[in-house]
From Swiss-Prot:
Cytoplasm among keywords: yes
Main location: cytoplasm
PANTHER family: RIBOSOME MATURATION FACTOR RIMP
Family designation: Belongs to the RimP family.
Organism of derivation: Nitratidesulfovibrio vulgaris (strain DSM 19637 / Miyazaki F)
Native organism taxonomy: Bacteria, Pseudomonadati, Thermodesulfobacteriota, Desulfovibrionia, Desulfovibrionales
Gene responsible for this protein: rimP
UniProt keyword annotation of rRNA-binding present: no
Gene3D superfamilies for the chain: RimP-like superfamily, N-terminal
Compositionally biased region (Basic residues): 204-215
Functional summary from the UniProt entry: Required for maturation of 30S ribosomal subunits.
UniProt keyword terms in alphabetical order: Cytoplasm, Ribosome biogenesis
Subcellular location as annotated: Cytoplasm
InterPro entries referenced in this protein's UniProt entry, alphabetically: Ribosome_maturation_RimP, RimP_C, RimP_C_sf, RimP_N, RimP_N_sf
Designated name of the protein: Ribosome maturation factor RimP
A GO biological-process term: ribosomal small subunit assembly
Length: 226
């Protein structure tokens, strides 16, 4: 079974199981190299309160061929991930969806969530993403990978502002591409600056070592070169 039919088959089983647990299927990644990895991402349903027991953790599921990644910073509990992992693993085995040996991973999308549909990008307009195009963009010969800010989403078209320009003498300009031309994309999480300001409004900085005053009649001595 090729990647796309397999992904659709796994999604058809995972979607109602996730819904019964009060969570939503976010997307599925299939890594086919050696032993196949089925990576299932689940998220809290829109409008649902964030559970009190969310935490980052990793737990191995009990069924053979099933591994769980229970990182849950987005509102999905570890218990929900574990239960879905067990139920989905058993269902895939009963239905014989995957013929070869595989590893099943169930987790939340995390802070740098991947995007599987263009509708998932809409709430993150203005944020920074990393995306890879299926083919190089005409204005960027040979380049497919970009770090950029999301400008807007219109229908099936994504517009983004790259952090660099094609030529050094130009400023970055927005690029619009069809979502079908995006091979993969994920959010870039920017951690806030926690540097404490010093008196006078300046942030703390390490002072550069100053050369010692020479002894009378001697040459200057700089400890930083020893």
């Amino acid at each position: 079974m090729s990647t796309y039919p397999l992904r659709d088959a796994v999604a058809a089983i995972a979607t109602p199981l996730a819904d019964a647990l009060g969570i939503a299927l976010w997307g599925i990644e299939i890594i086919d190299g050696g032993r196949m990895v089925l990576r299932v991402y689940v998220d809290a349903k829109p409008g649902m309160p964030v559970p009190a027991d969310t935490a980052e953790a990793t737990e191995s599921a009990t069924p053979e061929g099933v591994a769980l990644e229970g990182s849950t910073p987005e509102g999905v509990t570890i218990d929900q991930c574990a239960r879905l992992s067990r139920q989905l693993g058993l269902a895939l085995d009963v239905e014989d969806v995957v013929r070869d040996a595989y590893v099943l991973e169930v987790s939340s999308p995390g802070l740098e969530r991947p995007f599987f549909e263009i509708a998932q990008v809409v709430p993150y307009v203005g944020r920074t993403i990393e995306l890879t195009l299926a083919v190089p963009h005409p204005e960027w010969p040979g380049r497919r990978k970009f770090r950029a800010d999301i400008v807007r989403v219109e229908g099936d078209t994504l517009t983004f502002l790259p952090d660099t320009a094609p030529r050094p003498d130009e400023d970055p300009a927005p690029i619009s591409v069809a979502w079908d031309d995006v091979k993969k994309a994920h959010l870039i999480h920017v951690f806030p600056d926690t540097t404490r300001p010093q008196p006078g409004g300046k942030t703390g900085q390490r002072k550069k070592a100053q050369p010692k005053k020479p002894a009378r009649g001697g040459a200057p001595h700089d400890d930083t070169t020893d």
